[in-house]
Amino acid sequence: MSILDEFKSFIAKGNVMDMAVGIIIGAAFTGIVSSLVADLINPIIGLITGGIDFSNLFVNLGDGDYASLAAARDAGAPVFAYGSFITAVINFLIIAWVVFLLVKIVNRVKDAAIHKSAKEAEAQPAGPTQEQLLAEIRDLLKRSPA
């Protein structure tokens, strides 16, 4: 088997296709979560904490005084932008929580399907064994005129 054939076989597997779909959906989901955090959660946290905007929290490591992180970055000042890190952590926690819930739901659905198929398998009467079928064939052959 050539390397190209092996690659085609690898790509055609269901897990690779599922992973590709997951990555595409995950990339789209990241934008949604970023907007959720920046536009909805951070303002609520800011309201609770007295108007703190996490995305604008920074420590200036150089000379000068800057009113905002954007102004410090525009001036080329070295900054320790810990507010951006806090926002990234909040994004991560939300994404991790949603993925956890999705995996939990998928596992419940799988378990329910497995449980249902196991019940159906128990409910079906067992068919004749191979020996019983062979014995029936033998008996039929004995009875039939040659």
Swiss-Prot record:
GO molecular function, one term: mechanosensitive monoatomic ion channel activity
Domain of life where this protein originates: Bacteria
Keyword Acetylation on entry: no
GO cellular component: plasma membrane
Compartments it resides in: Cell inner membrane
Entry membrane topology: Multi-pass membrane protein
Gene3D superfamilies referenced in this protein's UniProt entry, alphabetically: Large-conductance mechanosensitive channel, MscL, domain 1
Keywords, ordered alphabetically: Cell inner membrane, Cell membrane, Ion channel, Ion transport, Membrane, Transmembrane, Transmembrane helix, Transport
Main location: membrane
InterPro entries reported for this sequence: Mechanosensitive_channel_CS, MS_channel, MSC/AndL, MscL_channel
Residue ranges crossing the lipid bilayer per the database entry: 21-41, 44-64, 83-103
Recorded coiled-coil stretches: none
Signal sequence bounds: none
PROSITE patterns for the chain: MSCL
Protein's job: Channel that opens in response to stretch forces in the membrane lipid bilayer. May participate in the regulation of osmotic pressure changes within the cell.
Subunit record text: Homopentamer.
UniProt family annotation: Belongs to the MscL family.
Protein's name in the database: Large-conductance mechanosensitive channel
Species the sequence originates in: Cereibacter sphaeroides (strain ATCC 17029 / ATH 2.4.9) (Rhodobacter sphaeroides)
Species classification: Bacteria, Pseudomonadati, Pseudomonadota, Alphaproteobacteria, Rhodobacterales
